[in-house]
Amino acid sequence: NLLRERNLRTPSLLHNAPTAGNHGAALIMQYLSDGKTLTECMQNAVTSQERHSLLSLATRSIATCHRFGLRQIDVHMDNFLLSDKEVYYLDGGQIQVQGESLEEELAYDNFALFLAQFKVENDEAIGDLLHEYHLENKTCSAPVYADILRRVKRARNLRLINYEKKLLRSTTANRNIRSLDKFAVYDREIHSPLLEDFISDPNRYIVKD
């Protein structure tokens, strides 16, 4: 395990085995009863100070990965679990190793990818987060705010392009319905028989004079 080899905290792997037909694998991980992902913690945070503290935790964790030459391909708050005031790394299968420490260009692009998932109004916190990052990873030169902001904007554009592509097909988040006479996309969280009925025949729901 790339994380354990570098003494980075991660839930213990208790058992793993291939699935039938060897199309995948099943993993049984250590259960941390009080564990919450940083996404869950962020949703429960009441004050801006609490949210900033959680972003700082994630930033330092990402910087630590980079210092050890590790890069999370799809880096986001769900990759980190907070348990007993300690941060655990998750989703080790989506981590690549790039040598003893991550090259500066890759490191800052990866950090920008993380920052790009948040709303634009949160960009005012980037300066403080860059300071937190550099405290944890001094293998890179001190990051320049304008350069990181440029990378964040580029990452946001790429995220938007990828999101638009996903709208053309069904995913775990969205359902896509396409036929000769209709095209509909909706969030699976709002799925219901009533919505299905509306999509199949919307004219029945139009009030006529």
Regions found by a protein language model. Give the residues of each.
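Intrinsically disordered, low-complexity segments enriched in glycine and mixed charged residues
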Residues: 157, 162-166
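Short alpha-helical scaffold element within the canonical Hanks-type protein kinase domain
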Residues: 51-55
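Conserved ATP-binding subdomain of kinase catalytic cores across diverse folds
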Residues: 1-38, 57-68, 72, 151-154, ...
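Hydrophobic residue at the +6 position relative to the catalytic HRD Asp in the kinase catalytic loop
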Residues: 75-82
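C-lobe/activation-segment region of protein kinase-like
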Residues: 88-153, 157
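AlphaC helix of the protein kinase catalytic domain
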Residues: 37-47
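A short beta-strand motif that forms the metal-chelation/ATP-contact edge
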Residues: 26-31, 86-92
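Short, glycine/acidic-enriched loop or turn micro-motifs at the edges of active sites
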Residues: 33, 77, 94
